[in-house]
């Protein structure tokens, strides 16, 4: 299992969400985040200079089976990519185990909805 963390533009979130659902990703979490990066700019508004170095993004957290890592990356990259600086990053992190709290199931089976237990 792997945890995929992706930091993407807020403006691309809906497209990425649709791409993940089309790629049969059943569940993921997301958060609005702010970050600092090389895209720092000073902007002038009504004669006052503002530092806009804090960048708004969306952070996605997805845990998938090993066989689903590449399709998940492809879905995110395909939907999030604009070709401009600041499109984001995708991180792939090993996951040692997963436990479904309700049933105690562990491993891959704990990742996905099981109609047997509903």
Where in the sequence are the language-model features?
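A generic structural signal for short beta-strands and their flanking turns/coil linkers
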Residues: 2-4, 24-29, 56-60, 86-89
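N-terminal first-folded block
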Residues: 3-42
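Short acidic, glycine/proline-enriched helix-loop-strand junctions
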Residues: 37-58
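Short, low-order "capping/linker" segments at domain edges
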Residues: 42-47, 97-114
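Mid-chain, well-packed structural core segment of small domains
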Residues: 51-85
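C-terminal structural segments of small proteins and small subunits
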Residues: 77-106
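Conserved small/polar residues in nucleotide/adenosyl-binding loops
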Residues: 116-118
């Amino acid at each position: 299992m792997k945890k995929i963390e992706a930091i993407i533009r807020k403006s691309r979130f809906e497209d990425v969400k649709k791409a993940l659902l089309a790629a049969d990703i059943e569940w993921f979490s997301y958060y609005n985040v702010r970050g600092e990066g090389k895209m720092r700019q000073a902007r002038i508004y009504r004669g006052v200079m503002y530092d806009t170095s804090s960048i708004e993004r969306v952070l996605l957290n997805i845990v998938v089976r090993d066989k689903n890592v590449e399709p998940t990356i492809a879905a995110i990259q395909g939907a999030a990519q604009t070709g401009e600086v600041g499109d984001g990053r995708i991180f792939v992190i090993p996951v040692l185990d997963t436990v479904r709290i309700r049933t105690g199931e562990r491993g891959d089976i704990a990742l996905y909805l099981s109609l047997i237990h509903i």
